[in-house]
């Protein structure tokens, strides 16, 4: 219902995808049902080979690797987003590339769940549209950038790895991914840009900052707590750390009460 609602909405501010969990929790019957119910022009999002069990289960139950299974069910394509892709081989990456499917890397989630490090640098080299995400592990994209940077250096034993790839994923890849669902141009700061999405950060460095070292300043010097003002679609949502679009104190109080009740339900 939400997907249909989003398709009918003409604000270009919301979009829907067919949400799937992971291959090891999705039967063939559910795959068929998703194919049947998915509206035209909409893709899927699904966790792929996040853990080794996902791959082992797919090989055992279906006799094929995960990306092959998704391809056989027509899940792949330019509107579909694959999360993680840790245990994928060259053939699977080629299949992702050939179908123009999108991938999102979630470094802290992978490390926190002790899942491993995906071949993300290889995916970028192959020309797969790759973005940077969090899988809910953090809400600070600068933090995700910093962790991705050191994770791939460590995994590849290469101090030069990820310097260029990760900011490319964050600033270019994420915008291109979003633009497969939204019409307005995203990921740019220029006069007349339809999105008009801006954040203002309180960052006053002691060392020079210019176009040649801006990525270093952003990665090492900036974090989410420095955001002072946010603008979305031309509307100021927060100014000088004051939220303007809701009663922040009430929202926080309601959240704390809901969290308390949820904890009581879980532990009862």
Regions of interest found by a model, annotated:
Residues 32, 68, 93-94, 121, ...:
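Alpha-helical segments flanking ligand/cofactor-binding loops in enzyme cores
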Residues 52-64, 92-97, 114-123, 138-156:
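Histidine/acidic-residue-rich catalytic or RNA/ligand-binding cores of hydrolases
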